[in-house]
């Protein structure tokens, strides 16, 4: 936060929400885990929202004959606070992978690891538009160029983030900023 920012800007910044994520990575003793390299789950009784299968993206992502699953379990300080540890989610993820039929009872779990990502995705809630206008207006008034997912406070693909950074650099280097 910028020291001395006006109270309305500080309050607006506090209204901007993002998700946090626990990534659970599982190694399994077979590679035919899914026909899709990524899939989504919107069931409230399943702990993960998205699954990726990294072994399908490159033969170097898992040993021959094995498969890998990366499960994403989402939280947010504003709506669903994270408590406990990332490791607390390993067994619930494996349980739900079995419930979905992606991991069978006779599959051998070769590896399991969990990690916590403090900043995952921008949340597009009803507070976002007005709060963003206030924060961006303040930064514009100070001549501060913002960029990327958390500067623009939007969802961006890698190429869009690069372009956002390029535009911010051009703005920062333009003669009008001097």
Regions found by a protein language model. Name each.
Residues 107-118, 171-178:
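Active-site-proximal substrate-binding core of FAD-dependent oxidoreductases
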Residues 1-3, 124, 156-157:
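Short glycine-/acidic-enriched loop or helix-start segments at secondary-structure transitions
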């Amino acid at each position: 936060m910028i020291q001395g920012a006006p109270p309305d800007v500080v309050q607006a910044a506090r209204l901007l929400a993002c998700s946090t994520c626990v990534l659970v990575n599982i190694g399994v003793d077979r590679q035919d885990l899914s026909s899709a390299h990524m899939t989504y789950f919107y069931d409230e009784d399943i702990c993960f929202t998205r699954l990726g299968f990294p072994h399908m993206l490159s033969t170097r992502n898992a040993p021959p004959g094995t498969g890998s699953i990366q499960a994403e379990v989402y939280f947010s300080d504003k709506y669903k606070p994270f408590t406990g540890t990332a490791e607390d989610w390993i067994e619930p993820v494996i349980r739900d992978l079995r419930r979905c039929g992606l991991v069978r009872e006779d599959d051998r779990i070769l590896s399991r690891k969990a990690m916590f990502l403090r900043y995952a995705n921008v949340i597009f809630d009803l507070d976002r538009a007005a709060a963003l206008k206030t924060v961006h207006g303040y930064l514009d008034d100070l001549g501060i160029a913002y960029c990327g997912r958390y500067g623009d406070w939007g969802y961006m693909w890698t190429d869009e983030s690069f372009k956002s950074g390029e535009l911010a650099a051009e703005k920062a280097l333009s003669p009008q900023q001097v």
